[in-house]
């Protein structure tokens, strides 16, 4: 779900009562400060800021606010000037700030002075009530269904909604199909459940099928909201958390995939089993391919947040050359978030690491940097068809 339903187009201003602008040090930085949050907000709540400066990502780890004495603050790393729009969230658009009735509100707006240095101070009145929040119409195609609203994740001691896409000819054929596993399932198929836009994976695959592609089954697992960072990194980040990625990948490889293979006409081998994600989902997809190359033989890594877990580089360098080698498809943008050079640099470093292990460019390894690419759903939606075709083609 997008902020104010249309986060980028919505230009309504909202100045929170009591907002204060204060002079800041002579640096091109903006500090955002919350002096209070709604009663009942957990003491250990992860509060994020999402805005036009980070692609409206509701749970970007580098935009998590720091708690201090009952208040929360963050200083943006990137220079900003002029008007900015933003909202505060608890890690998803289903838990963004709202009004006292639990409904969505317009984006906050603030014009940074010409120096680019300022502090915005405000308060959150309430968090959105998902039960009363208006939602856009569903955009999922007929091939999409909910495999389970509460699929057991024994490895993590919780449940999760899991989505399923079946190819157009699944019901009328006896074919077996490759399977692609995706993260952040809320964003994969349906605008009614997505935040900041959906990928349109179902429409993309339907179109490719109409042009002669053999088709694929897609299994998309919802992220866990405030558990997202924990589940999408095998290693702890001192500031942002993490550390449950091993268990999450074990769930995918040992529980979810066997279930799908038992109940649907799949081609279960690694050459027909892919995993793909963006940002933190890109990080955990890469890790899944390294840990289980005999399971996930096709790996899509979009805008990977490798900075979150630098241990991924030593993990890749230590890969056993005797094990199967997956195909890895990397894509990142030259305009990624607050520090695009970090994403470009880290992708290049990982590609060099894999090439040093013998992965062959063009057949086992593909990497591209898109000049216009940003850390945003529209970018990943656009890049999906090319990644899918490269991973499963030939």
Regions found by a protein language model. Name each.
Residues 331, 337, 342-352, 356-394:
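C-terminal catalytic histidine-bearing segment of alpha/beta-hydrolase fold enzymes
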């Amino acid at each position: 779900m997008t902020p104010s339903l249309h986060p980028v187009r919505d230009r309504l201003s909202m100045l929170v009562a009591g907002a204060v602008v204060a002079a800041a040090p002579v640096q091109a930085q903006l500090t955002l400060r919350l002096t209070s949050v709604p009663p009942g907000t957990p003491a250990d709540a992860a509060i994020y800021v999402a805005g036009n400066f980070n692609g409206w990502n509701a749970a970007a780890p580098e935009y998590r606010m720091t708690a201090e004495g009952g208040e929360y603050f963050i200083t943006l790393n990137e220079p900003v000037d002029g008007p900015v729009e933003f909202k505060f969230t608890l890690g998803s658009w289903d838990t963004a700030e709202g009004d006292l009735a639990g409904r969505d509100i317009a984006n906050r707006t603030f014009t940074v002075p010409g120096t680019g240095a300022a502090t915005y101070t405000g308060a959150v009145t309430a968090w959105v009530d998902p039960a009363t929040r208006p939602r856009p119409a569903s955009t999922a195609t007929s091939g999409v269904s909910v495999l389970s609203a509460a699929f057991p994740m024994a490895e993590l001691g919780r449940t999760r909604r899991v989505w399923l896409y079946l190819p157009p000819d699944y019901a009328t054929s006896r074919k077996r199909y490759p399977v692609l596993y995706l993260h952040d399932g809320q964003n994969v198929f349906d605008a009614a459940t997505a935040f900041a836009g959906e990928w349109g994976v179902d429409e993309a695959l339907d179109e490719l099928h109409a042009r002669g592609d053999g088709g694929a089954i897609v299994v998309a697992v919802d992220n866990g909201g405030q558990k997202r960072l924990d589940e999408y990194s095998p290693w702890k980040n001192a500031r942002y958390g993490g550390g449950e990625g091993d268990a999450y990948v074990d769930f995918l490889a040992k529980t979810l995939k066997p279930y799908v293979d038992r109940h649907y006409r799949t081609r279960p081998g690694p050459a027909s089993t892919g995993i793909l994600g963006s940002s933190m989902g890109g990080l955990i997809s890469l890790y899944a391919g390294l840990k289980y190359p005999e399971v996930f033989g096709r790996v899509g890594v979009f805008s990977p947040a490798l900075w979150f877990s630098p241990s991924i580089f030593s993990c890749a360098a230590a890969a056993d050359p005797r094990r199967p080698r997956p195909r890895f498809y990397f894509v990142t943008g030259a305009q990624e978030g607050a520090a695009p050079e970090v994403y470009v640099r880290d992708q290049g470093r990982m590609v060099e690491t894999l090439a040093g292990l013998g992965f062959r460019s063009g057949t086992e390894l593909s990497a591209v940097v898109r000049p216009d690419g940003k850390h945003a759903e529209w970018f990943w939606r656009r890049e999906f068809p090319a990644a899918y075709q490269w991973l499963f083609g030939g």
